[in-house]
Amino acid sequence: MAEEKLSARTQLPVSAESQKPVLKKAPEFPILEKQNWLIHLYYIQKDYEACKAVIKEQLQETHGLCEYAIYVQALIFRLEGNIQESLRLFQMCAFLSPQCADNLKQVARSLFLLGKHKAAIEVYNEAAKLNQKDWEICHNLGVCYIYLKQFDKAQDQLHNALHLNRHDLTYIMLGKIFLLKGDLDKAIEIYKKAVEFSPENTELLTTLGLLYLQLGIYQKAFEHLGNTLTYDPTNYKAILAAGSMMQTHGDFDVALTKYKVVACAVIESPPLWNNIGMCFFGKKKYVAAISCLKRANYLAPLDWKILYNLGLVHLTMQQYASAFHFLSAAINFQPKMGELYMLLAVALTNLEDSENAKRAYEEAVRLDKCNPLVNLNYAVLLYNQGEKRDALAQYQEMEKKVNLLKYSSSLEFDPEMVEVAQKLGAALQVGEALVWTKPVKDPKSKHQTASTSKAAGFQQPLGSNQALGQAMSSAATCRKLSSGAGGTSQLTKPPSLPLEPEPTVEAQPTEASAQTREK
């Protein structure tokens, strides 16, 4: 009993620390987004090989469930031109996160780049349900509708985009719609609003200047092109347009000086060499003109205006077989232009192929309802063939067109045209019915065709991209990463960028002044 009491007294108290259970180390679960910061860093540094290596490692660790890694890999595939593979990866992202509008926007963009515009519109509409206030979705829908030629729907979507957020690119695309419709006044109105919103945008200023130039409003054209050169003295489009205006007014030396500046920036520009060639043509340096036009034709073999000018220069040099070659090629690309058939008929007449010349004149008369040169040249051919009755009919038709032009405009007719018309009228014995009664100096005994110069009044301007950018490209304006959204490790994805047009007008038309004679 005494021993039990002794042992009870000698017992030590148990430590509180020893009573605590031993803590086990927590298991390490794989974090899907732990390498996102590194992927983001390599991507914005454009170190795509290192970026792809990290993405591969990340996808192996996460068994292909890291959405951001898949997203960036899809962006890299798109940059490398592998659009189909990028579409597949973006569709995976949309499957992993179906409520994310950015994923759907990128799927739609890939479909757009593949030319599947209807499918892209469907996906953009799905994205719009998730985010109704995204200007980019409305903008890209408008661009898709433009490619489908549904201009009214495109116009509505672009107006919605401007209502949500005003952007230069949306104004440009809206202006393109009116240009494609042929409504220059509406296009100018849109571009004026765009310039008010962004007065230092040289692309907008240049396009607006070219539109005024196309309408013959030279003062405003000079003003806007001058503003372009104020902000960007090396803007080759504005310099080329300014040189074209000087060339149109016959100041060939100053125009060539301007073109020399442009040549330093864009040496392989078809409109540049076309305009230089026509400057030499205006200076009557025909060999140099042909050399420059041949270079333009090499750079743009499908441009009918360059072929037209080559045919015109060869006609002037009396190289009728070469003229026939280039004019025939131009007709293949522009079969609805009556003046091309008229020049082809002049070449055929000088090649002594009267039957085909008549056919060409008949086609020219059918297509061109307002150019009196066509009827006058046809009348000369018929008179020389002894068909005076038909020649008289063409001469009278020419008189009707001349009278109509006199009343509707203050156009000055080419002196050679007046001379030939007077001689032919006298030969046909129309007498008092002559349109022109002005006496002619130094009459010649042989009937000649009228000039195709200054008619110019009737000629279409001959430049190389007159229709101010009719095609839109799918390239993006910039490649930015937007600021981070919620979450600590998940980075915000690079946005699906708005679709933009190709660079607009390269050059404004040049004049083509030549004197072609039918012998």
Curated annotation (Swiss-Prot):
This is BBSome complex member BBS4. GO terms for cellular component: centriolar satellite; centrosome; ciliary basal body; ciliary membrane; cilium; cytoplasm; motile cilium; pericentriolar material. Coiled coil: none annotated. One of its GO terms (molecular function) is protein-macromolecule adaptor activity. TPR repeats lie at residues 67-100, 101-134, 135-168, 169-201, 203-235, 237-269, 270-303, 304-337, 339-371, 379-417. It comes from the Eukaryota. Keywords: Cell membrane, Cell projection, Cilium, Cilium biogenesis/degradation, Cytoplasm, Cytoskeleton, Flagellum, Membrane, Protein transport, Repeat, TPR repeat, Transport. Belongs to the BBS4 family. Residues 461-476, 510-519 have a biased composition (Polar residues). InterPro entries: TPR-like_helical_dom_sf (IPR011990), TPR_rpt (IPR019734). Part of BBSome complex, that contains BBS1, BBS2, BBS4, BBS5, BBS7, BBS8, BBS9 and BBIP10. Interacts with PCM1 and DCTN1. Interacts with CCDC28B. Interacts with ALDOB and C2CD3. Interacts with PKD1. Interacts with CEP290. Interacts with DLEC1. GO terms for biological process: centrosome cycle; cilium assembly; protein localization to cilium; protein transport. The keyword Zinc-finger does not apply. Residues 101-337 are annotated as: Interaction with PCM1. May be required for the dynein-mediated transport of pericentriolar proteins to the centrosome. Required for microtubule anchoring at the centrosome but not for microtubule nucleation. The BBSome complex is required for ciliogenesis but is dispensable for centriolar satellite function. This ciliogenic function is mediated in part by the Rab8 GDP/GTP exchange factor, which localizes to the basal body and contacts the BBSome. Rab8(GTP) enters the primary cilium and promotes extension of the ciliary membrane. Residues 439-519 are annotated as: Disordered. Its main location: cytoplasm. The gene is BBS4.
